[in-house]
Swiss-Prot record:
One of its GO terms (molecular function) is structural constituent of ribosome. It comes from the Bacteria. Part of the 50S ribosomal subunit. Forms a cluster with proteins L14 and L19. The keyword Cell cycle does not apply. GO terms for biological process: translation. InterPro entries: Ribosomal_uL3 (IPR000597), Ribosomal_uL3_bac/org-type (IPR019927), Ribosomal_uL3_CS (IPR019926), Transl_B-barrel_sf (IPR009000). The keyword Magnesium does not apply. Pfam families: Ribosomal_L3. Belongs to the universal ribosomal protein uL3 family. The lineage of its organism: Bacteria, Pseudomonadati, Chlorobiota, Chlorobiia, Chlorobiales. The gene is rplC. One of its GO terms (cellular component) is cytosolic large ribosomal subunit. It comes from Chlorobium limicola (strain DSM 245 / NBRC 103803 / 6330). This is Large ribosomal subunit protein uL3. Keywords: Ribonucleoprotein, Ribosomal protein, RNA-binding, rRNA-binding.
């Protein structure tokens, strides 16, 4: 049981004992360190703040330099918080967090930000069918149709599906299986797809039994 931060490297495939191809995502989960321990007495809640990667100290501002220095760790690229209950052991600031806290075959949830698609119409964003392709139609092919009545109700209802910014949402993909663990290179190979583009950061959390 554990939790860790990771960087999405890309997708590949592995073959199981039956010679079946399995689509997998490779995640660089480390080096990770505890940068802060939060407690209910001081902060109002219990959590571990985890940082990932090693970054040049000159490329971060002074407050963040002090924050990393206090923990006694090298500055990282990103930090995220995890509940203490997601770890099977007590950690202190500066302790490493390794992929060895997971096991092959274990099920995890992966949290990330989905790919941003920019401003999208209703056909792409909500899978609308669009207008009829015949009977004199000239410019209604990908139009949304009516979005509110005339005199009644004289307004557009809140939540009506319309064109707008698509993607860039917080997504959790559940029950993904860890196919392979490579501790020497801090790699996790997870069955299936995880949210976000290449080189984006994700949170990997064990499923509580």
């Amino acid at each position: 049981m554990g939790a860790i931060l990771g960087k999405k490297i890309g997708m590949t495939r592995l073959y199981n004992d039956k010679r079946e191809a399995i689509s997998c995502t490779v995640i660089q989960a480390g080096p990770c360190f505890v940068t802060q321990v939060k407690s209910a007495e001081k902060d109002g809640y219990d959590a571990y703040q985890i940082g990932i990667g090693e970054r040049d100290e000159k490329k971060i501002n002074k407050p963040m330099q002090g924050h990393y220095r206090k923990a006694g760790v090298t500055p990282g690229f990103m930090m995220a918080e995890f509940k203490k209950t997601e770890f099977s052991e007590n950690l202190e600031a500066g302790n490493p967090v390794s992929v060895e806290s997971f096991k092959e075959g274990e099920k995890v949830n992966v949290l990330g930000v989905s790919k941003g698609k920019g401003f999208a119409g209703v056909v792409k964003r909500h899978n609308f069918g669009g207008g009829s392709r015949t009977h004199g139609q000239s410019d209604r092919l990908r139009a949304p149709g009516s979005v509110g009545g005339s005199s009644d109700p004289s307004r557009t209802f809140r939540g009506t599906r319309m064109a707008g910014r698509m993607g860039g949402d917080n997504i959790t993909v559940k029950n993904l299986e860890i196919v392979k663990i490579m501790p020497e290179s801090n790699l996790l190979v997870i069955k299936g797809a995880v949210p976000g583009p290449k080189n984006s950061y994700v949170k990997i959390v064990s499923i509580k039994k």
